[in-house]
């Protein structure tokens, strides 16, 4: 029955009760839209930025309603959605499909989260022209920002090329899943003085090139905190990089405890103490905002 005491017809939403993603409209509409300018201001103000991956309309709308600032349509979908062992096989077409799903879910819910979409392996490495063609397609699919991996000179050149043409960029420094084989497997990066210095130099170059955000993955806490303090305008987002970054990101499946393998040290299962998925999302946002996640002793690396 609906609120007027009348039974709804099968397959038809009750009066005043919105179906699927629209059910989150009332919550999400209370927040201002997250923009690149808003991200920059949060960084300056010291307000933690909560980022979460999502790959479809329903979960994207739920994450947005829970207060997630940015939703990342990551090429991690290759592993959690497609069953691959790495992200290398994810295509641009895959990314476009899932970006459209997320964008439509947030739009339907009148949401406010900023959407970041990955440029997958092979979609930007050939040339600046290939990079912008791929990035434009992702923006047309609903992304507000594109993410690409690496900090070598040619990657920095692509970042600058895209930014100069009006495409916001999120960079991604070690561990970058697309290059996991070249880096010798999934392991913490930047522990030697030489490796740490390279990460500092790469991060500075990406900052100067105009990257709005930068994911720092599996980097010692002290190094990630130091890099964050050296940024002129780029907001750092940590995953296994300690609590000193401007924000945090987790793969949705990981933070819900849905993992077929061994859970990474930097992951916290927010579903364990939640009665449902939206509650788990809200708990994650609250923990990022108040600084209780990550706990450097439990989730960080020395």
Swiss-Prot record:
Q: Which Gene3D superfamilies match?
A: Phosphoenolpyruvate-binding domains
Q: Whose protein is this, by species?
A: Zymomonas mobilis subsp. mobilis (strain ATCC 31821 / ZM4 / CP4)
Please give the family membership noted in the entry.
Answer: Belongs to the PanB family.
| Cofactor remark | Binds 1 Mg(2+) ion per subunit.
What is known about what this protein does? Catalyzes the reversible reaction in which hydroxymethyl group from 5,10-methylenetetrahydrofolate is transferred onto alpha-ketoisovalerate to form ketopantoate.
Which CDD domains has this protein been placed in?
A: KPHMT-like
Enumerate the UniProt keywords alphabetically.
Cytoplasm, Magnesium, Metal-binding, Pantothenate biosynthesis, Transferase
- GO molecular function per UniProt: 3-methyl-2-oxobutanoate hydroxymethyltransferase activity; magnesium ion binding
Indicate which residues the UniProt annotation says bind 3-methyl-2-oxobutanoate. Answer: 75-76, 118, 147
Required cofactor names: Mg(2+)
- InterPro entries tied to this protein: Pantoate_hydroxy_MeTrfase (IPR003700), Pyrv/PenolPyrv_kinase-like_dom (IPR015813), Pyrv_kinase-like_dom_sf (IPR040442)
Query: Where is this protein found?
Result: Cytoplasm
Taken from the UniProt entry, a GO cellular component term is:
cytoplasm
Give one Pfam hit by family name.
Answer: Pantoate_transf
Q: What is its pathway? A: Cofactor biosynthesis; (R)-pantothenate biosynthesis; (R)-pantoate from 3-methyl-2-oxobutanoate: step 1/2
- Enzyme active site: 217 (proton acceptor)
Primary localisation category: cytoplasm
Protein name, as recorded: 3-methyl-2-oxobutanoate hydroxymethyltransferase 1
Q: What class of enzyme is it?
A: transferase
Q: How does it assemble?
A: Homodecamer; pentamer of dimers.
Question: Which terms under GO biological process does the entry name?
Answer: pantothenate biosynthetic process
Annotated EC:
2.1.2.11
The source's domain of life comes to: Bacteria
Q: Which amino acid positions bind Mg(2+), per UniProt?
A: 75, 118, 149
């Amino acid at each position: 029955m609906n609120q007027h005491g009348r039974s709804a017809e099968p397959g038809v939403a009750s009066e005043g009760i919105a179906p699927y993603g629209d059910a989150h409209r009332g919550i999400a509409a209370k927040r201002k839209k997250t923009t690149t300018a808003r991200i920059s201001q949060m960084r300056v103000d010291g307000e933690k930025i909560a980022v979460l991956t999502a790959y479809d309309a329903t979960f994207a709308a739920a994450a947005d309603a829970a207060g997630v600032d940015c939703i990342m349509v990551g090429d991690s979908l290759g592993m959690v959605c497609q069953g691959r062992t790495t992200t290398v096989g994810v295509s641009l077409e895959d990314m476009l499909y899932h970006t459209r799903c997320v964008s439509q879910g947030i739009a339907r819910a009148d949401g406010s989260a900023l959407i970041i979409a990955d440029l997958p392996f092979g979609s930007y490495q050939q040339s600046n022209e290939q990079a912008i063609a791929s990035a434009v397609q992702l923006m047309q699919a609903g992304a507000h920002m594109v993410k690409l991996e690496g900090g070598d000179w040619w990657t920095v050149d692509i970042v600058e090329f895209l930014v100069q043409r009006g495409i916001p960029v999120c960079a991604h420094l070690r561990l970058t899943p697309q290059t996991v084989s070249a880096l010798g497997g999934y392991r913490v990066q930047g522990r030697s003085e030489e490796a740490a210095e390279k990460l500092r130099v790469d991060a500075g170059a990406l900052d100067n090139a105009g990257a709005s955000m930068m994911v720092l993955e599996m980097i010692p806490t002290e190094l990630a905190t130091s890099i964050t303090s050296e940024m002129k305008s780029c907001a750092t987002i940590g995953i296994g990089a300690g609590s000193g970054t401007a924000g945090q990101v987790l793969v949705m499946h990981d933070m819900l405890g849905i993992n077929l393998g061994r859970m990474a040290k930097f992951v916290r299962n927010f579903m364990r103490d939640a009665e449902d998925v939206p509650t788990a999302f809200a708990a994650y946002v609250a923990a990022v905002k108040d600084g209780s996640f990550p706990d450097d002793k439990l989730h960080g690396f020395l």
